[in-house]
A protein has these predicted regions:
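Non-heme di-metal
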Residues: 1-319
Length: 319
């Protein structure tokens, strides 16, 4: 009989990067429910009203980007997979983007009141700079070429998130909100793999283009980055001018914009390097976690769940 549908065979790998990425992502699987966020409540109460407002807004913005990535971003690049294993990796990425988006709600429910949470989401869903970057990226997801979609995804994963990531990393470096920052470090660890992987898949397609097409496409890539950077500068000023961190955040953004370009196999655009970034924040960006140990309750990484033997009554569902 003619083959109607093919089973995926993980014993026949066409691209070793698919397998190594799958293994990396599954190895670092995590859930927000395993982080003891309530341990940060003492730190939270000591923050000023302005600082609390900043934290709420940056996490609102990050929630929006992760929501878009989980709903339309991964779907947009799924149609152009080269191997069935690539599609499996994208399934994993899509699920983890949903975990990331949910994690911010876990932070909100721990630190904020119901009315504060409502205000955060109201701000997020109406902020002009957030909505502008969402529109720029999502328009490409809906109307761009397969290569353009991969560029948009890599810019989002490796560049646009970082105006928000700066805040928790800064507090972590100052011994505040350590468990909130632990979630952010876990998210950064995921996004680092996502951006590298999708950038690699982009390079495979880009390198197949004739030289002239590469030149015009490269122009489009840098134009898009400039457009996003200009909007991100306005967004950053609106968030950080009040606490005086704007210039440091912009340096951090330029550094990560260069990383996004390098993931895509392109030359960096900005002069900023890791040495220019606030060392406290740079230290926090390392993709290890403070205590990624399922068998320990020491530190601020994963906590061991409480296990008890099953009883007969446990099987009386709804009785």
């Amino acid at each position: 009989m003619e083959t109607y549908y093919k089973a995926i065979n993980w014993n026949e790998i066409e691209d070793a990067i698919d397998k190594s990425t799958w293994e990396k992502l599954t190895e670092q699987f995590w859930l927000d429910t395993r982080i003891p966020l309530s341990n940060d409540l003492d730190d939270w109460r000591k923050l000023s009203a302005e600082e609390k407002d900043l934290v709420g807004k940056v996490f609102g913005g990050l929630t929006l980007l992760d929501t878009m990535q989980s709903q339309t971003g991964v779907e947009a690049i799924r149609a152009d997979v080269r191997t069935p294993h690539e599609e499996a990796v994208l399934n994993n990425i899509q699920f983890m983007e949903s975990v990331h988006a949910k994690s911010y709600s876990s932070i909100f429910s721990t630190l904020n009141t119901k009315s504060e949470i409502e205000k955060i989401f109201e701000w997020t869903n109406s902020n002009e700079y957030l909505q502008t970057k969402a529109k720029i990226i999502n328009d490409i997801y809906e109307n761009g070429t397969p290569l353009q979609k991969k560029v948009a995804s890599t810019y989002l994963e490796t560049f646009l998130f970082y105006s928000g990531f700066f805040t928790p990393l800064y507090y972590l470096g100052n011994n505040k909100l350590a468990n909130v920052a632990e979630i952010i470090k876990l998210i950064i660890r995921d996004e680092s793999v996502h951006g590298t992987y999708i950038g690699y898949k982009f390079q495979l397609g880009f390198n197949e283009l004739p030289e002239k097409e590469q030149e015009s496409f490269r122009e489009w890539m840098y134009d898009l980055l400039y457009q996003l950077y200009e909007n991100e500068e306005l967004y950053t000023k609106s968030l950080y001018d009040g606490v005086g961190w704007t210039e440091e955040v912009m340096t951090f953004l330029r550094y990560n914009a260069n990383k996004a370009l390098m993931n895509l196999g392109q030359d960096p655009l900005f002069p900023d390097s890791a040495n220019d970034v606030n060392p406290i924040v740079m230290n926090g960006i390392s993709t290890g976690t403070s205590n990624h140990d399922f068998f320990s309750q020491v530190g601020n990484g994963y906590l061991l769940g409480t296990v008890e033997a099953m009883q007969d009554d446990d099987y009386n569902y709804g009785l």
